């Protein structure tokens, strides 16, 4: 395919036009009085959202240069969303302001490389200042406040704070759609996985269709069980101990399954067989997690253990196990705390090494099942459009709250960024074009606060000047129009969100400024007369 090439100012201005188109659509959502954006979908109802990254992903521009510019800014929003879960609109607004200031300086003859260095040094100094001034999250109310700001809803904030309080910071909080109106919180004790009983004959409570085992032994096996002779020696030992048995294996079938079912129906021996979750290496890892949690061992020929020679010392224990047709929950496994902590650290290290979003998510789930717990927030709404929008807001707010616990919180409303810059620039000694680049950052950090003010119907420049002269932590509460102590008023942002937004915006701005040529695909022209030469009767012209 033929390519088009643009150089110098033409290249940079083309990219800037694309960036401005995208940023202008996104920035109307910023702040408590920000508006929503409606996104058309090819199928189903349109989506209404105020989430920066969701809006950015939907924007596709026709002009090749503008398209590339928009894609670069999408990357800012996406990276900020991946790292911090929020702050995507702030990052987009910052990127737009940084590029605008930087291009003005490049056009005036400044060295793009020196500007880039100045931007990077200023960004690093501000990021350090942000972390220095961050306040650690100490109360449930602070978590509720930061989540409520992200979701724009106090009730959502309180529910997330309660969920985090119950499952801990390692726990997983998932959001599901509910058929009922409103919000519900469902908590899971212990480890839960998505596999139920192999046969409904294992049920102990026919009304609820679940099997409940108190103080059971737990057999963990990496292979199938079909031959009852392999299982019998172990079954006899468990029966002598007068305890129920939970079997988690690749599968239980044939005469082995029939034997377990017959003994359960006769009341001779209480047991439940469940398929192990996952596939391949992930299944092995999850079985090992369960072994450590319950204080047992995975019986596998790989480690020289055979089912026929297994004894009770290889089995895990738990206070209770509840199995439904779809899921199994192990409550209070009898594993050694030190071993569990070691396994948790192993999984954490794997999460840091992994570069796949999917793998990271699965590892995070495993971590939660071992170290914390699982909370499910069920959201309902009057219409499908509102439900999707609400679910998305809750997911963002959950990640926002986790970011707040990680690095602490700052005054919200764009104030912390502005005030941290004033402090950071006191010790920054730069000269020439590097100083010009740093100055671009100093001017650009006002953009989020100005945009919040504009969306609230106020004059952005006037608000920014006033906030610069206030005590650190004091600023504009855009919801009320009052200037006050934002931390005390519960208007807070996670330091991780603010820092990530600035660093990602600066990274893309530096790329914009140092771009000297852009290569894009040349749009293909439709073949002349292709449509005109087509047979209007589709090749059936002779038929009457």
Swiss-Prot record:
The positions annotated for binding ATP are: 29-32, 86-90, 413, 477-479, 493
Q: Give EC number(s), comma-separated.
A: 5.6.1.7
Q: Where in the cell is it found?
A: Cytoplasm
Keywords attached to this Swiss-Prot or TrEMBL record, sorted alphabetically, are: ATP-binding, Chaperone, Cytoplasm, Isomerase, Nucleotide-binding
Q: Which reaction does it catalyse?
A: ATP + H2O + a folded polypeptide = ADP + phosphate + an unfolded polypeptide
- Database matches in CDD domains: GroEL (cd03344)
Q: Which residues form a coiled coil?
A: none
Enzyme class, broadest EC rank = isomerase
InterPro entries for this protein: Chaperonin_Cpn60_CS, Cpn60/GroEL, Cpn60/GroEL/TCP-1, GroEL-like_apical_dom_sf, GROEL-like_equatorial_sf, TCP-1-like_intermed_sf
Q: Which GO terms describe its molecular function?
A: ATP binding; ATP-dependent protein folding chaperone; isomerase activity; unfolded protein binding
Q: Where does this protein chiefly localize?
A: cytoplasm
Per the record's keyword annotation, is Transmembrane helix included, yes or no?
A: no
Q: Quote the Pfam families the UniProt record gives.
A: Cpn60_TCP1 (PF00118)
Q: Which domain of life is it from?
A: Bacteria
Give the record's GO CC terms.
cytoplasm
PANTHER family found in the cross-reference section: 60 KDA HEAT SHOCK PROTEIN, MITOCHONDRIAL
Summarize the protein's role.
Together with its co-chaperonin GroES, plays an essential role in assisting protein folding. The GroEL-GroES system forms a nano-cage that allows encapsulation of the non-native substrate proteins and provides a physical environment optimized to promote and accelerate protein folding.
HAMAP family from the UniProt entry: CH60
Q: How does it assemble?
A: Forms a cylinder of 14 subunits composed of two heptameric rings stacked back-to-back. Interacts with the co-chaperonin GroES.
Stated name of the protein: Chaperonin GroEL 1
Species annotation: Saccharopolyspora erythraea (strain ATCC 11635 / DSM 40517 / JCM 4748 / NBRC 13426 / NCIMB 8594 / NRRL 2338)
